[in-house]
Amino acid sequence: MPYNCCLPALSCRTSCSSRPCVPPSCHGCTLPGACNIPANVGNCNWFCEGSFNGNEKETMQFLNDRLASYMEKVRQLERENAELECRIQERNQQQDPLVCPAYQAYFRTIEELQQKILCSKSENARLVVQIDNAKLAADDFRTKYETELGLRQLVESDINGLRRILDELTLCKSDLEAQVESLKEELLCLKRNHEEEVNTLRCQLGDRLNVEVDAAPTVDLNRVLNETRCQYEAMVETNRREVEEWFTTQTEELNKQVVSSSEQLQSCQAEIIELRRTVNALEIELQAQHCMRNSLENTLTESEARYSSQLSQVQCLITNVESQLGEIRADLERQNQEYQVLLDVKARLECEINTYRGLLESEDCKLPCNPCATSNACGKPIGPCVSNPCVPCPPPAPCTPCVPRPRCGPCNSFVR
């Protein structure tokens, strides 16, 4: 890459006089980035006909080539940086519609599933509470059933005891009736015997003479027997009425107890039937709730497995994207470091250019006063591109002092 310096007046100056080179005070200065500068820079040789000597031209050419290489490297790195930024933007534009909406959809799905899981948990808790309440109600009904069953057994035992008493009373009644019949038969036998005895006595007395004797009055046996019979009949009737009344009262009490027990038994049976129906309904509902809970648990397990796999895939995608972002960030850091290095190099080059400009300006001030001459006294052109110095010239003619030239522009023109 040739380098064109914006110093047009330097190539058109001509003089037969000599000028000194760089002042000796600048010989030992160390410029930044000038460690590869040839050692012949700054030798105090005389310019021949206003041109640089060979060593200075080589040094300037070396510095120009170095500056051009640095600038080319800076431009190349800037182009690479722009290409990388374009690639990063393209990648972001390509990945934005793929990653972000998918993540949002996944997040919405995860939130919906979390809401469903919370609803299922609350529903399961509610069902567990209902099951516990049903179990408590079933336990209460079972306790009531056992209590009523105990009462029923007690009533049945009382009924059995009363039935035994009724059987005993029936036997006693039959015994008393048998005794009454036997007493009636005995009374009839006594009546017959008494009549027979009376008849026999009458027959015996009818054949005898009537002898009247003053004696105590005789006892009327018929009257005595009638009185005795009346007393026994009254006693039997009294006992019979008392036994009938006692039997009637006992029978009424037993009937009342049997009726109340039968009513209680019917109510207990109806309550037992209702409790059995309730227990069966609760068992059916419990089985249905168990089936529903199992199905919900299976659905929850499947959903967790499915969404865990999807979440692992999304996590892998996120990991890949993060690794790519890490690589891009590392690349950007590396480019930033290179850019900082290039900025430092650019700063050093600018310092060198300023130094060279100062040197050139100092050299310009020391050139002859005739800036418009294009050839030396020997008739040869002069300029920065002359490779060989001119032959010795005759003594120069006196000239007027040169006027200081304005500064030239910075060397910023590069031609590929």
From Swiss-Prot:
Keywords: Coiled coil, Intermediate filament, Keratin. Gene3D superfamilies: 1.20.5.170, Single helix bin (1.20.5.500), Vasodilator-stimulated phosphoprotein (1.20.5.1160). Residues 220-363 are annotated as: Coil 2. Residues 2-56 are annotated as: Head. Residues 56-367 form the IF rod domain. GO terms for cellular component: intermediate filament. It comes from the Eukaryota. Residues 204-219 are annotated as: Linker 12. Residues 57-91 are annotated as: Coil 1A. Residues 364-416 are annotated as: Tail. The keyword S-adenosyl-L-methionine does not apply. InterPro entries: IF_conserved, IF_rod_dom, Keratin_I. The record marks A305 as: Stutter. Residues 92-102 are annotated as: Linker 1. SMART domains: Filament (SM01391). GO terms for molecular function: structural molecule activity. Residues 103-203 are annotated as: Coil 1B. There are two types of hair/microfibrillar keratin, I (acidic) and II (neutral to basic). Belongs to the intermediate filament family. This is Keratin, type I cuticular Ha1. It comes from Mus musculus.
